[in-house]
Amino acid sequence: MANFSDFYFDSSTGKNRIYVRQWSPEGEPRGIVQIEHGIAEHIERYDDFARFLADNGFIVVGDDHLGHGKSIDNGGEQGFFAESDGWDYVVWDIDRLHDIMHEKYPDLPYIFFGHSMGSFLVRTYIIRHPEKPDAVIISGTGHQPLPMVLGGLAMASAAVKLYGAHKIGNTLNNVAFGAY
């Protein structure tokens, strides 16, 4: 039966604290799986999956990203990463969690699991840090043609300039998620 514990670390923003849940196996661990959740999710949604992995010998760890789950209670705002460079802050926090766990268990294989938005975060992470993971699992990811990505970025940038970074934009939300 897996055990779990919680801890926090200081976010790379310098303003927030990031909530972490860790599930541990009863016996000797055979590896570490770091879960990166999707948009509008939190790490505790992965409890059944994490317990399954822990019951099969893995240490499982995952954080609530900036603006998600219990990280909101520590200086965050729901769904909001940062005024600027928000994506980078989340990727830096992912790296910090990796480093915390790798310091504790330097000899264990390290696996990243990213779902939905978490898959894009993990994809960014492995581009920046290809030497750190031993394996990567990408779930529920996607791909858009470059013109659509550039158009979406232009729309988002214009909306931030017009309304500010904290405004929830229904038009942009519908364009981004309407098909889902």
Feature locations, PLM:
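Residue in the alpha/beta-hydrolase core beta-strand immediately N-terminal to the catalytic nucleophile
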Residues: 64, 111, 135-137
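Alpha/beta-hydrolase-fold enzymes
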Residues: 124-180
